Every structure is written in C-alpha cells, then in structure tokens.
C-alpha cells in the first residue's frame, strides 16, 4: 500500500471552485468560506506557505446583481465577474482578518505567464507576499481576459490556473477542492459501482476518457480539466490531491496522510510502507 507523506510539504496551493463557494440557491456559502479561512490561517500559524486560487467572481456577481443565470453576452459576463470579484475579495479580507491573517489579490491572464519579463514580475510578487506572511488569493482576470485565436489570454478555467500557479511558485503540493470525492473509474453520478481511485501515478488515455463531463451552472471546470491540471502538475514534478471540498477541515486530515480523495503523484517518487 502506498503511503502519503506530506511532512516535508511547506508551500501549498489550495484551489476552491465556485460550486464550493456558492450554494445551489445562488447565495454565498458563508460557512464554507469561514472554514476555509480557519484552515488556511491554522496552516500559516504552523509555518506553512499557502496560496489560494479561488473561483467565484461570477457566482458572487450573480448574487449581488440578483441574476438567476450567467449572461450569454461576453461583455455582460465580464461586468458581472468584475462586480463579483470585488465582493468576493471584500468577504475574504473580512473573514481572514478575524483569524489575524492578511490576504492580497493577484489577478492573472495567460499572457502574463507566457512572456518571461511579466512572468518574472508575477513570480517576484508571489515571493514577496509569501515572505511577508500574506496569503495571495488568485483568480483569472475575467474582466479583461479573452479567448480569441490571435490573442488568447484566458487559462480556460481555474483548475488549469491553479496548476500554473503551483508551477511558477514551485509549490510542494496542490490541493484541489471539488464537489466530488476525487477521481473515479467511471461517473459516480451515473454508475453505482464506480470506484474511487486513491492514487494516480500516470495520466493514461483510459483516465482521460473516463473524465468527461462539464462543470456546474456557476462554474466552468469539469473532471477533464482536473485531470489535465494533474498532468501539468506532473510535468512540473509536483503532486496534487483532488478531494471533496464539503468540509475544508479535511485539508488538515489530508496533510496528516489520511487517504482522502485522489492523490496524483508519479510512481517513481512514491514511498511504500
């Protein structure tokens, strides 16, 4: 049996999706955000370095503007996200402050990490914030990012963004919170006999084929993007845990080595009992 060893993990990227932050009613999940802030603050107090990649700008914007569904018009989508981003960061700042943890905002577009000079600048920004004991909260800059063939600046979704952030910050571990327990061998919402994969050492065609499906009405990420993100993590010699975000305190259990979710780690690096 492969044992998870996270004792030496110092720098952690945690990604939380819209489905974990916004209730099915469209209202903000205040309890979840409070739990997340508590966990991250606890980790910071223990000497860990934590970067939070947070979706939710669209969900927050829809709630504030009392809109029931995402606009189809791109300009309106960007406007709603812009409103929601301010509200989301305001709430994060208030709740983290209760736990005496300071946060900052970093909004990225894909072109920032493509060009060496801007990549160096954003890397330095991360390092400076971390050295000051601040939790960077990262999101895609939805108000200005586009997905045009001649000038693509979108990452696609925040699953991929979290993998990019983990790579450029040389994080020891990416923890991806989802609305599902991990990666299954088939869709658990359709097949009752679906089995959770506890460990994935390689992203095979079989795994890619079984990871179909889209995201929620508030978010964009599906299981396929999570698998593709794991592949990006592997390319950077990193590791990732995909787990259910229903109880953020489970992050602490994962770091203790408990076998929750799916652990993505290349097999040549796995330690055995």
From Swiss-Prot:
Which sites bind substrate?
Answer: 55, 142, 158
Q: Which PROSITE patterns match?
A: GLUTAMATE_5_KINASE (PS00902)
* Subcellular localization, as worded in the UniProt entry: Cytoplasm
Q: What is its EC number?
A: 2.7.2.11
The family database entries (InterPro entries) matched by this protein are listed as: AceGlu_kinase-like_sf, Asp/Glu/Uridylate_kinase, G5K_ProB, Glu/AcGlu_kinase, Glu_5kinase, Glu_5kinase/COase_Synthase, Glutamate_5-kinase_CS
GO terms assigned for molecular function: ATP binding; glutamate 5-kinase activity
Q: Output the GO biological process annotations, alphabetical, semicolon-separated.
A: L-proline biosynthetic process
Residues binding ATP: 15, 178-179, 220-226
Q: What class of enzyme is it?
A: transferase
Using the UniProt record, give the first listed, main subcellular location.
Answer: cytoplasm
Q: Name one GO cellular component term.
A: cytosol
Q: In which pathway does it act?
A: Amino-acid biosynthesis; L-proline biosynthesis; L-glutamate 5-semialdehyde from L-glutamate: step 1/2
Q: What UniProt keywords apply to this chain's record, in alphabetical order? A: Amino-acid biosynthesis, ATP-binding, Cytoplasm, Kinase, Nucleotide-binding, Proline biosynthesis, Transferase
Q: Which reaction does it catalyse?
A: L-glutamate + ATP = L-glutamyl 5-phosphate + ADP
What SUPFAM superfamilies does the annotation carry? Carbamate kinase-like (SSF53633)
Function, as annotated, reads: Catalyzes the transfer of a phosphate group to glutamate to form L-glutamate 5-phosphate.
Q: Which family does it belong to?
A: Belongs to the glutamate 5-kinase family.
PANTHER family attached to this UniProt entry? GLUTAMATE 5-KINASE (PTHR43654), ISOPENTENYL PHOSPHATE KINASE (PTHR43654:SF1)
Protein name as annotated: Glutamate 5-kinase
Q: Which organism is it from?
A: Streptococcus pyogenes serotype M1
């Amino acid at each position: 049996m492969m044992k998870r060893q996270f004792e030496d993990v110092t720098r952690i990227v945690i990604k939380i999706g819209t489905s974990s932050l916004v209730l099915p009613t469209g209202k903000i999940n205040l309890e979840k955000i409070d739990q997340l802030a508590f966990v991250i603050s606890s980790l910071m107090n223990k000497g860990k370095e934590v970067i939070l990649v947070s979706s939710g700008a669209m969900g927050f914007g829809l709630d504030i503007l009392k809109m029931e569904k995402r606009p189809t018009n791109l300009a309106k989508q960007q406007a709603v996200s812009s409103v929601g981003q301010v509200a989301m960061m305001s709430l994060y700042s208030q709740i983290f402050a209760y736990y005496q943890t300071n946060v900052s905002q970093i909004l990225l577009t894909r072109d920032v990490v493509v060009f060496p000079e801007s990549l160096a600048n954003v890397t330095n920004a991360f390092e400076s914030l971390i050295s000051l004991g601040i939790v960077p909260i990262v999101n895609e800059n939805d108000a200005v990012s586009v997905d045009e063939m001649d000038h693509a600046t979108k990452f696609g979704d925040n699953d991929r963004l979290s993998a990019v952030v983990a790579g450029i910050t040389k994080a020891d571990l990416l923890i991806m919170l989802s609305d599902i327990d991990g990666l299954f061998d088939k869709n658990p919402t359709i097949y009752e006999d679906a089995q959770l994969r506890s460990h994935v050492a390689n992203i095979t065609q079989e795994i890619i084929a079984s990871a179909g499906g889209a995201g929620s009405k508030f978010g964009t990420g599906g299981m396929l993007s999570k698998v593709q993100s794991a592949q990006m993590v592997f390319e950077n010699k990193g590791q990732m845990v995909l787990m259910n975000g229903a109880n953020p305190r489970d992050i602490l259990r994962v770091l203790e080595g408990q076998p929750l979710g799916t652990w993505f780690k290349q097999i040549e690096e796995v330690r055995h009992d």
